[in-house]
Amino acid sequence: MEKQIFEHSVNVEEEHYQPKQEFHNMEAKLDEALDGELLDAQLEQALKPKSSFRKTLLKFTALLFGLATVAQSVQWIWDSYQQHQWIYLAFALVSLIIILLGIKEIICEWRRLVRLKKREQLQQQSQQIWLESAVKNGDVFSVHNAEKSKILCLDIAKSLGLENDSPAVIQWQHQLNEAYSAQEIAHLFSRHVLSSFDAQAKKLISKMAAESAVIVAISPLAVVDMFFIAWRNLRLMNKIAEIYGIELGYFSRIRLLRMVLVNIAFAGATEVAQDIGMDWLSQDVTAKLSTRIAQGIGVGLLTARLGVKAMELCRPLAFQLNEKPKLSYIQQELLSSVKDIVLGKNKIYKKEQI
């Protein structure tokens, strides 16, 4: 047997490297936003006050008109008194009183807007403090930002009508530590001080959303639903603002009116679609009942969405991660409320037919 010699050959495969790619003046295509994100962005854009030269000119013109009206009323009173025209004098006095009452309401409205602006500034300050604390070294907490966060939280407590010796504030102060960052201080403040206000707002949102859903589900008239949703949404905004110590005026309500109109349009459009669809498909009671339940839940969720947005705007301390209320906790309650009311009504209706 002959000896076989095997030669060890090393096969070196050539590696092919992809050359580098260079991009010059390339356009980046952004991902499309979700529907919910678009609604939030549109709402926030609608709520932001738009300052322009026309608005400044309009304010200046209104001020001149008010001063001229007051001066004309005073001149009218003086001329009527000099000429002994008592009827004209009475009209002039009434006009002056009405003008003064209007000026008083304008001043009160301006004060409400100032309070709302201060609340927005508190939110912006809290966000700025958290941003500065996050940008700095994560291991070494900034003492300056921590002190600013404490002062901001105390200012927020005063805006809510809470003194430094209130039980919630004292409990929050006992939980503080020198090693805590600005975000941790604000989180403790939210948990010990703002939690009671947040609980009231969440309970109110759930209650009014469920009521709106039930009424829309059992009401056969679209016009009634539209006016009912408008009234309930305005009342919801007022109550949430009252919980957080804000008195909404005319112009501050206008800033949230677009979301209310969305709810009104949804209630009216879905009810009209329901009527047309049921007439076209069939007169089946079960199908109509299912459509009404879905419609009521949809309106209830939109009402809850409005309440959460109003809560986010009226809350003095901006929400941190995982603090903002979600609509998931309202869905089950809405479903159970609408099913109990509507299905109970359907059983009574069937018994009457029998």
From Swiss-Prot:
Major site of localization recorded for this protein: membrane
Its membrane topology: Multi-pass membrane protein
Key words, A-Z: Cell inner membrane, Cell membrane, Membrane, Transmembrane, Transmembrane helix
Transmembrane parts of this sequence: 57-77, 87-107, 211-231
Subcellular location: Cell inner membrane
Highest taxon of the lineage: Bacteria
Annotated GO CC locations: plasma membrane
Signal sequence extent: none
Stated family: Belongs to the UPF0283 family.
Name assigned to this protein: UPF0283 membrane protein CGSHiGG_02710
